[in-house]
Amino acid sequence: CYACKQVCPLCYCEQCIVDKSMPRWIDSSATVKGNFAWNMIRAFHLSGRCIGCNECERACPADIPLSLLNRKMGTVAMNEFNYRHGTDVNQPTLIGNYNVNDKEDFIL
């Protein structure tokens, strides 16, 4: 339903990937596959940026504990990439920044 997207202060992309239809990257149907894809993509986009306001959980009609996923992604961002949001206003987002020295051992 994307209620979390509508209420999140950090969802501000001009065109969200779930709204893109050519090509359709994310299945927008209310299925396990579509829900999983949406929540994972959103977690990646917010990794290291979530401010912990928990509005996503408040807005979720399915009571999905989204803050757990967001906190985990923030921890991974810090541990794996030494990235912490809010420390520098000029710092690019985690997924908006490429560093040739980033770890790659998790890539299959």
Locations of regions flagged by a protein language model:
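Ferredoxin-type iron-sulfur electron-transfer modules in oxidoreductases and energy-metabolism complexes
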Residues: 12-108
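Long, well-ordered mid-to-C-terminal structural blocks that present hydrophobic/aromatic surfaces
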Residues: 1-13
